[in-house]
Each structure stands twice: as structure tokens, then as C-alpha cells.
């Protein structure tokens, strides 16, 4: 254990995903060695994130405005909605350059063992969005692009059950080809692009 603020910094860094005790200690001592202006810039960025970053009121993606740039872009097809778990998954799909619709970010996946049920996800917002015709456009297709793991598949199955009886709505799931147990964000652009292009009807 180190003294005072050094240990406090290590403890806080260790709370970040993917950062273990050794990594937290290494980052902390790196920060202690850099010039004060570098620390000031990092502090300023963290303050801007705290004060200026919000979630899009339509899709739930991260944004610095009430609507993210994708939901604000009239060139995007509002009738086509790709459902993903996290904002990082939006970036993964965008890198494929294969999708010109809009997104809906659930904020996670169903995981009863961790206490994450339907009420903890943005499923009701998705249903409201389909029913309310955002920007005057009917949603014609929902593409379910949750991760190809147990939680993602459970979430996809639940969504199909909630969406399949909505008149005029097609529900599809991205095709196989992504490794089971993987995360969407780590899929290469070509594989993910093919999975989108080869999506299959679910309802």
C-alpha cells in the first residue's frame, strides 16, 4: 500500500474495466512522471466528459447534444434501426460502412445473475420509438446486433418475442460468422459487414 493520494489514484484506476492492480499502479506512476500541463489536459478532458457528454434522447448513443450526429443526419434511413448493446458497438458497426440506418443502444444485455432484467435496459424506449414514428418515419426493420454470447442471444430472443407481432415490422438478426462468446467491438470490419449483409429474418 502506498500513502495518501497515490494509493487513492491506484484504487480509482483499478475500478476501470480491464485495469488490474498492476496496471493501475503502472498508470499511476506514469501520471506522476509526466509534466503538469499533461495532467492539466487530462483533467480538462475528464471534466468535459463529466459536464458535457450526455446520451442521445432518441437512440441512447453518447453525444454532446440532445441528439447524436447519426440521429440528426437526414441522410440516414430512419426506417432501419440496428439494436446494439453499448455505444462502442455503434462505432464497430459504423466502421463497416455497410449500414446507413440508425441505431438503438440498449445499455447492456439481459443477465439475470447480475440483476440485469428488461427494466434495466432501454427496451421500452425501443418499443415507444417504433410506435411513435420518430421524425415521421415508420420503422420497417429492426436489426438485432447484440453480442454473440449467452447474454446477447438471450437479449435477442427476448426482443424477437416483444417485436414479432408489430404489424409491418421485419425483425432480423445479424448472420453467423462472428465467434460465439465474442464482443461486437472486436470483430473486424469485413466479418461484421458480411454479418450485417447476411442478416436473417427472425419474425
Curated annotation (Swiss-Prot):
Gene3D superfamilies, sorted: 3.30.60.80, 3.40.1360.10, 6.10.250.240, RecR Domain 1
| Transmembrane feature ranges | none
InterPro entries associated with the record: DNA_Rcmb_RecR (IPR000093), Hlx-hairpin-Hlx_DNA-bd_motif (IPR003583), Rcmb_RecR (IPR023627), Rcmb_RecR_Znf (IPR015967), TOPRIM_dom (IPR006171), TOPRIM_RecR (IPR034137)
Which BP terms does GO give this entry? DNA recombination; DNA repair
Q: In terms of domain of life, where is this protein from?
A: Bacteria
Positions of the zinc fingers (C4-type)?
A: 56-71
Q: Does the keyword Repeat apply?
A: no
Give the UniProt keywords, A-Z.
Answer: DNA damage, DNA recombination, DNA repair, Metal-binding, Zinc, Zinc-finger
> Keyword Zinc: yes or no?
yes
What GO molecular function terms would the record report? Answer: DNA binding; zinc ion binding
Q: Which residues form the Toprim domain?
A: 79-179
NCBIfam families assigned to the protein according to its UniProt record, in alphabetical order: recR
PANTHER family attached to this UniProt entry: RECOMBINATION PROTEIN RECR
Sequence similarity: Belongs to the RecR family.
| Entry function | May play a role in DNA repair. It seems to be involved in an RecBC-independent recombinational process of DNA repair. It may act with RecF and RecO.
Please give the name of this protein. Answer: Recombination protein RecR
Q: What is the lineage of its organism?
A: Bacteria, Bacillati, Actinomycetota, Actinomycetes, Mycobacteriales
Amino acid at each position: 500500500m502506498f500513502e495518501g493520494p497515490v494509493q487513492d489514484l491506484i484504487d480509482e484506476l483499478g475500478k476501470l474495466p480491464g485495469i488490474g492492480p498492476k496496471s493501475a499502479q503502472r498508470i499511476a506512476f506514469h501520471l506522476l512522471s509526466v509534466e503538469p500541463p499533461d495532467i492539466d489536459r487530462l483533467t480538462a478532458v475528464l471534466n468535459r466528459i463529466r459536464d458535457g457528454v450526455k446520451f442521445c434522447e432518441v437512440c441512447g448513443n453518447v453525444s454532446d447534444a440532445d441528439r447524436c450526429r447519426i440521429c440528426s443526419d437526414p441522410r440516414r434511413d430512419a426506417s432501419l434501426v440496428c439494436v446494439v448493446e453499448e455505444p462502442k458497438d455503434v462505432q464497430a458497426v459504423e466502421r463497416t460502412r455497410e449500414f446507413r440506418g440508425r441505431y438503438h443502444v440498449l445499455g447492456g444485455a439481459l443477465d439475470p445473475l447480475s440483476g440485469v432484467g428488461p427494466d434495466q435496459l432501454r427496451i421500452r424506449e425501443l418499443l415507444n420509438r417504433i410506435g411513435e414514428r420518430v421524425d415521421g418515419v415508420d420503422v420497417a426493420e429492426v436489426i438485432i446486433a447484440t453480442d454473440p454470447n449467452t447474454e446477447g442471444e438471450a437479449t435477442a430472443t427476448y426482443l424477437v418475442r416483444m417485436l414479432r407481432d408489430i404489424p409491418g415490422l421485419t425483425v432480423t438478426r445479424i448472420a453467423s460468422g462472428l465467434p460465439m462468446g465474442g464482443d461486437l467491438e472486436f470483430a473486424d470490419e469485413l466479418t461484421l459487414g458480411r454479418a450485417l449483409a447476411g442478416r436473417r429474418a427472425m419474425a
